[in-house]
Amino acid sequence: MKSVTLKELSLLLDGVVQGDETLVINSVATLEHATAGQISFLANSKYRAQLESTQASAVLLSAKDAQDYSGTALVVKDPYVGFARVAQLLDTTPKAAIGIHPSAQIDPSALLGEGVAIGANAVIGANVILGENVQIGAGTVIGQDCIIGSNTRLWANVTLYHNVHLGQDCIIHSGAIIGSDGFGYANERGQWIKIPQTGGVRIGDRVEIGASSTIDRGALGHTEIHNGVIIDNQVQVAHNDIIGENTAIAGSTTLAGSVTIGKHCIIGGNCAIAGHLTIADGVHLSGATNVTGNMREPGLYSSATVAMENKVWRKNTVRFRQLDELFQRVKTLEKNSNTPE
């Protein structure tokens, strides 16, 4: 088990210890469930009531919250960021054993860096390049001409089609499929003609892609996911989409083809973005927002209808259907009221 003293954590986080700096911390936990040897945090005022009753050995607090706290604390600028850093330091996620499992199938032309780990029944195709310390989980398939940067991890049962490039320090979770064909067809007299998807996928450094998400290859040119992007579970990224640096996309969101999303955007869960649109840097979409036009200015955008009692929703649905009629009636009334007698 990993462990660290509060003094060492204060140096890591540029914080100040309030209490015993020799206290040893071995893991992180919530205020409600923490026990001795664990450190917790307060980043949301909704949980302030749990602060006095917590059994945590220490708590990450802002300077303001630390003033009224009698227990041991590590005072930092941002308790949530501090929690993330400590959680990384004490992370106990198991790492794959270095080496190649006997059941793995590796093409002779593949180039493997030092320290790679390849699990049972994994398949590595022709001309694949794996950087140093790459971890390939059991049952994962890497198609030909793929490149995977150093320290990237693919968990079990990930599929990379051909011509997919992953940067360094990426994490791809189980069930993710990268490089499948985009939804490209032409219609000739009622019949669909498949358009070969001849591009690839280019993914930058420090990208994380959640379980069962799908990233389509480009039709012509590449689908691009830039450095620092985080994508949640069950997200669909279509052909030729471009996602800017450090953008976050929450679960069940769907992007149609040829969408360009800027840097530092936050896309809430269950959003839908129509094709061939551009979204500016710094846009934040709240959950279940439907985007049908370009967004050229940063800011928070929403379109979802919030939950309400069914009887109220049914009445409002009827009223919504009557909006055009009501508008025309108001327009007529305004016109008549402005007509001289």
UniProtKB/Swiss-Prot annotation:
Assembly and interaction partners: Homotrimer.
UniProt catalytic activity: a UDP-3-O-[(3R)-3-hydroxyacyl]-alpha-D-glucosamine + a (3R)-hydroxyacyl-[ACP] = a UDP-2-N,3-O-bis[(3R)-3-hydroxyacyl]-alpha-D-glucosamine + holo-[ACP] + H(+)
Signal peptide: none
Matches recorded under PANTHER family: UDP-3-O-ACYLGLUCOSAMINE N-ACYLTRANSFERASE, UDP-3-O-ACYLGLUCOSAMINE N-ACYLTRANSFERASE 1, MITOCHONDRIAL-RELATED
Name of the protein described by the UniProt record: UDP-3-O-acylglucosamine N-acyltransferase
Protein purpose: Catalyzes the N-acylation of UDP-3-O-acylglucosamine using 3-hydroxyacyl-ACP as the acyl donor. Is involved in the biosynthesis of lipid A, a phosphorylated glycolipid that anchors the lipopolysaccharide to the outer membrane of the cell.
Pfam families given in the database record: Hexapep (PF00132), Hexapep_2 (PF14602), LpxD (PF04613)
GO BP term, example: lipid A biosynthetic process
Superkingdom field: Bacteria
UniProt GO MF annotations: N-acyltransferase activity
Family: Belongs to the transferase hexapeptide repeat family. LpxD subfamily.
